[in-house]
């Protein structure tokens, strides 16, 4: 479920905001149908929904372009999830111009940031500063993920309105859905909304499958494997809701209709897109590669500390934010594990970034952390050379080169020997001798021989555990229309029985309300009962009480307490003496 989400600043930043913000009169008129879709009307539209939505924060006028087909996962089919855009005509065109790295860095500094001694951008307006910044402060706790219970979709002239989100152009495409640029009218912020098709998830995953052979045991190491593609999405959502790190993309909101096909996930928009395209004739300099690779190390260390294996690290999944730092995205094939490492047995991810042990025909189980380290090595190679170390158009030949071909470095550009040593140790074909993340953090090239030390694990990581209950409750489902109608009818009839079964409930006698048979009698009721008992003792033995309603004082006749004490129960013989208070307390 890999999706490459990237964006470039638009040449006209004000236009999309006016189009999406709904400032004009025509826009306000088009929003009136959304106000009318409250209550049952809005629920009736749920039956037409066929998606999950994921949204990511983005800046006004941003677009996202796709990575190359070779960078996409093996399962990608390139098909778009169908989305109702009836009545849509011309869609607003977002600029396709990309900024160079020099323009990006200059634009970041012009926005009010400054550089520290290590060349990192310090942005005081952000909720947190870069970890290595001298002005760094503890990060604020992340905003909790919103779980929407109601969804309404309205088609407009050039876009689709989904709750408070206005969906615009497609900015990315993955194996199981598309990513849309979304504008939130409540907070005036752009997001990236991921629309997933449940049917496509199940179909491309090959479900239903045959059960495993008898006697098959799960792989040791405590690796949690989802039972199916839908459960895998829910696990991804539960993981993303807990992650809070400057170098990991954040999940904002999730919407789900259990009776329809689509799931909607909303992510923060990382506006500058992927760190680079592969292949490219303009690779990064060593200083730029070191800057981004330090962020990648901190993000991977945080994920491994949270017991998560990403399994799809590549440049197209490393998105550059406003502050110039990268964020790791796309957890569609990630694995959660227990213990010290994940022992995996399946092969997922992008072919050019797969480790040789995952392609071996003899090795059945392999380390999850070592897979991420190999992918980090291929990514660093791409940073400085603009291409993958092992390439072939035929997938089987590519697998053969990854497993057996020796690592070679091009003559140009000329890189430092320390960098060659680091890449060689990360691309060691033997996972047992391959370098690990704690050793990478201390490598001379990464730290510039001690001049730029990375933060310790305690400073960079805080453990967050995801329970099975949180995975089950990762998405709040929207109730179906029939259920809502049934509940509202039961509330209106004040009955817990099914109002559509045709049987009528027996009418209750007005002479003995249930609350008067169970609640404690008041002082007025007790005094009136004592008065009646005294009057009965003074009357002759053969005297009968006067018929109900046929005389007596107005106070006694109008008192509901006396009415309940004197009234006979339905279907029972009339009593010849009044009820005592303790008798009135006992329900029949």
UniProtKB/Swiss-Prot annotation:
The record's region (Disordered) falls at: 1-33, 78-100, 128-149, 205-225, 497-588
User: Tell me, what controls this protein's activity?
Assistant: Activated by Ca(2+)/calmodulin. Binding of calmodulin may relieve intrasteric autoinhibition. Autophosphorylation does not alter activity or regulation by Ca(2+)/calmodulin. In part, activity is independent on Ca(2+)/calmodulin.
Q: Where is the composition biased (Low complexity)?
A: 128-139
Q: Which InterPro entries match?
A: Kinase-like_dom_sf, Prot_kinase_dom, Protein_kinase_ATP_BS, Ser/Thr_kinase_AS
Pfam families recorded: Pkinase
According to the record's subunit comment, the protein's assembly and interactions are: Interacts with calmodulin.
Tissue spec: Ubiquitously expressed with higher levels in the brain. Intermediate levels are detected in spleen, prostate, thyroid and leukocytes. The lowest level is in lung.
Broad class of the protein's primary localization? nucleus
EC number, as in UniProt: 2.7.11.17
User: What are the binding positions for ATP in this chain?
Assistant: 171-179, 194
Q: What name does this protein carry?
A: Calcium/calmodulin-dependent protein kinase kinase 2
| Active site annotation, chain numbering | 312 (proton acceptor)
Q: Summarize the impact of residue 182 to T.
A: In a colorectal adenocarcinoma sample; somatic mutation
Q: Where is the Protein kinase domain?
A: 165-446
Q: What is the lineage of its organism?
A: Eukaryota, Metazoa, Chordata, Craniata, Vertebrata
Tell me where in this chain the PTM Phosphoserine is found. 100, 114, 129, 133, 137, 495, 511, 572
Cite the post-translational modification comment.
Autophosphorylated and phosphorylated by PKA. Each isoform may show a different pattern of phosphorylation.
Query: Single GO molecular-function term?
Result: ATP binding
Instruction: Give me the ranges of the annotated region Autoinhibitory domain.
Output: 472-477
**Record organism:** Homo sapiens (Human)
Start and end residues of each stretch annotated as RP domain: 204-226
Region described as Calmodulin-binding: spans on this chain: 475-500
* Similarity comment text for this entry: Belongs to the protein kinase superfamily. Ser/Thr protein kinase family.
Q: What keyword terms does UniProt attach to this protein?
A: Acetylation, ATP-binding, Calmodulin-binding, Cell projection, Cytoplasm, Kinase, Nucleotide-binding, Nucleus, Phosphoprotein, Serine/threonine-protein kinase, Transferase
């Amino acid at each position: 479920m890999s999706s490459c989400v990237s964006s470039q600043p638009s040449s006209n930043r004000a236009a999309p905001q006016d189009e999406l913000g709904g400032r004009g009169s025509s826009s306000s008129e088009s929003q009136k149908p959304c106000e009318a879709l409250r209550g049952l009307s809005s629920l009736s539209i749920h039956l037409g929904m066929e998606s999950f939505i994921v949204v990511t924060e983005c800046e006004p006028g941003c677009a996202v372009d796709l990575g190359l087909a070779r960078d996409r996962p093996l399962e990608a089919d390139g098909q778009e999830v169908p989305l109702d855009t009836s009545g849509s005509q011309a869609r607003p065109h977002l600029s396709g111009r990309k900024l160079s790295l020099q323009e990006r860095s200059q634009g970041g500094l012009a926005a009010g940031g400054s550089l520290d001694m290590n060349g990192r951008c310090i942005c005081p307006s952000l909720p947190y500063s870069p970890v290595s910044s001298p002005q760094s402060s503890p990060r604020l706790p992340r905003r909790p993920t919103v779980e929407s219970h109601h969804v309404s979709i309205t088609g407009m002239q050039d876009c689709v309105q989904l709750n408070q989100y206005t969906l615009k152009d497609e900015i990315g495409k993955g194996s199981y859905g598309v990513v849309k640029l979304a504008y939130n009218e409540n907070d005036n912020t752009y997001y990236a909304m991921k629309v997933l098709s449940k049917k496509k998830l199940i179909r491309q995953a090959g479900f239903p499958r045959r059960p495993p052979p008898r006697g098959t045991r799960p792989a040791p190491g405590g690796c949690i494997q989802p039972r199916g593609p839908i459960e895998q999405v829910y696990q991804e959502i539960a993981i993303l809701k807990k992650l809070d790190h400057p170098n990991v993309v954040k999940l904002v909101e999730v919407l789900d209709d259990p009776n329809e096909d689509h799931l909607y996930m909303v992510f923060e928009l990382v506006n500058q897109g992927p760190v680079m395209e592969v292949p490219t004739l303009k690779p990064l300099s060593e200083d730029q590669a070191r800057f981004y690779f330090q962020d990648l190390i901190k993000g991977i260390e945080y994920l491994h500390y949270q017991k998560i294996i990403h399994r799809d690290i590549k440049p197209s999944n490393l998105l550059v934010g406003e502050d110039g730092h990268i964020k790791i995205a796309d957890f569609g094939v990630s694995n959660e594990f227990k213990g010290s490492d994940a022992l995996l047995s399946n092969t997922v991810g992008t072919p050019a970034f797969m480790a040789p042990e995952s392609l071996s025909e003899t090795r059945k189980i392999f380390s999850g952390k070592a897979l991420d380290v190999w992918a980090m090595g291929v990514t660093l190679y791409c940073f400085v050379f603009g291409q993958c170390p092992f390439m072939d158009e035929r997938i089987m030949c590519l697998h053969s080169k990854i497993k057996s071909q020796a690592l070679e470095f091009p003559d140009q550009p000329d890189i430092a020997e320390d960098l060659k040593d680091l890449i060689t140790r990360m691309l060691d074909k033997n996972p047992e001798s391959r370098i690990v993340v704690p050793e990478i953090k201390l490598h001379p090239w990464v730290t510039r021989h001690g001049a730029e030390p990375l933060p310790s694990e305690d400073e960079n990581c805080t453990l967050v555990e995801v329970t099975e209950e949180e995975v089950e409750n990762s998405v709040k489902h929207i109730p179906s229309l029939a259920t809502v109608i049934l509940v509202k009818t039961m509330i209106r009839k004040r009955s817990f029985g099914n109002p559509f079964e045709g049987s009528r409930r027996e009418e209750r006698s007005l002479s003995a309300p249930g609350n008067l048979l169970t609640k404690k009698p008041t002082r007025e009721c007790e005094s009136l009962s004592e008065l009646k008992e005294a009057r009965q003792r003074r009357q002759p033995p053969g005297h009968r009480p006067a018929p109900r309603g046929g005389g007596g004082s107005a106070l006694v006749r109008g008192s509901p307490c006396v009415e309940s004490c004197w009234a006979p129960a339905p279907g029972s013989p009339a009593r010849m003496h009044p009820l005592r208070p303790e008798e009135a307390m006992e329900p029949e």
